[in-house]
């Protein structure tokens, strides 16, 4: 009887170890290589812009702070973009449970942790109705990469690395800091501040997956 117990324990331990190895291997394959950008690195602005413009699919994870109408909220987020399709999951200290905003060029939906789902033609209308604030998703797929929306008027400033430090477009004032090189090719920011009217978004990007 004791031998059977020992064998069972050994098998269970081996199974747990195998699961951990598989999990760690899976995580390793999804993590994108990230390196620091030194102050001496100077990027070619045109090449960088076109490389980032071609980047159509990614996942960004981090933290967002929202200040609006003298109120402040915060949440963790997972933001996925695949061409024109996007998904933004907000969870944590938001105060309303977790929510997910999904959409494309035709429609947008918002689902909460209670199983309720609402749809609208655009994310701004839906988020203002349900949250009182909004994320400019139409521009975000460009701005989160620190590039301007193509063919729309904008003003910008560059830092010593020849990367965007400030951008004004579509009524938004955006500032960038703490860049890192992702996948050995893409200089991407880790801190973004976006302001328009009485709304300010502070976005911290903890990890990129490309």
Swiss-Prot record:
InterPro entries per UniProt: LolA/LolB/LppX, OM_lipoprot_LolB
Signal peptide stretch: 1-26
Pfam families cross-referenced by the UniProt entry: LolB (PF03550)
Main location: membrane
Gene3D superfamilies per record: Lipoprotein localisation LolA/LolB/LppX (2.50.20.10)
Localization of this protein: Cell outer membrane
SUPFAM superfamilies with a match to the protein in the record: Prokaryotic lipoproteins and lipoprotein localization factors
Membrane topology: Lipid-anchor
Annotated transmembrane regions: none
Residue positions of covalent lipid attachment, annotated as N-palmitoyl cysteine: 27
S-diacylglycerol cysteine lipid attachment residues: 27
Annotated GO CC locations: cell outer membrane
PROSITE patterns noted in UniProt: PROKAR_LIPOPROTEIN (PS51257)
Top-level taxon of the source organism: Bacteria
Entry keyword set: Cell outer membrane, Chaperone, Lipoprotein, Membrane, Palmitate, Protein transport, Signal, Transport
Gene Ontology biological process terms from the UniProt entry: lipoprotein localization to outer membrane; protein transport
Family designation: Belongs to the LolB family.
Function: Plays a critical role in the incorporation of lipoproteins in the outer membrane after they are released by the LolA protein.
Assembly behavior: Monomer.
HAMAP family: LolB
Name under which the protein is recorded: Outer-membrane lipoprotein LolB
Organism (species): Francisella tularensis subsp. holarctica (strain FTNF002-00 / FTA)
Gene: lolB
């Amino acid at each position: 009887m004791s031998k059977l117990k020992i064998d069972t324990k050994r098998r269970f331990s081996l199974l747990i170890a195998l699961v951990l190895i598989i999990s760690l291997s899976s995580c390793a394959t999804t993590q994108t290589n990230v390196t620091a950008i030194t102050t001496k690195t100077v990027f070619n602005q045109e090449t960088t812009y076109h490389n980032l413009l071609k980047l159509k699919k990614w996942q960004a994870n981090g933290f967002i702070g929202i200040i609006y109408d003298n109120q402040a909220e915060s949440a963790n987020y997972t933001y996925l973009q695949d061409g024109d399709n996007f998904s933004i999951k907000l969870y944590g200290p938001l105060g309303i449970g977790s929510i997910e905003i999904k959409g494309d060029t035709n429609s947008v939906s918002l689902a909460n942790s209670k199983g309720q789902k609402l749809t609208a033609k655009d994310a701004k209308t839906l988020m203002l109705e349900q949250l009182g604030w909004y994320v400019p998703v139409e521009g975000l797929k460009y701005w989160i990469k620190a590039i301007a929306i193509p063919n729309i008027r904008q003003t910008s400033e560059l830092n010593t690395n020849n990367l965007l430090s400030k951008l004004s477009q579509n009524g938004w004032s955006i500032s960038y800091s703490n860049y890192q090189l992702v996948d050995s090719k893409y200089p991407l920011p880790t801190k973004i501040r976006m302001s328009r009217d009485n709304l300010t978004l502070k976005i911290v990007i903890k990890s990129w997956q490309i």
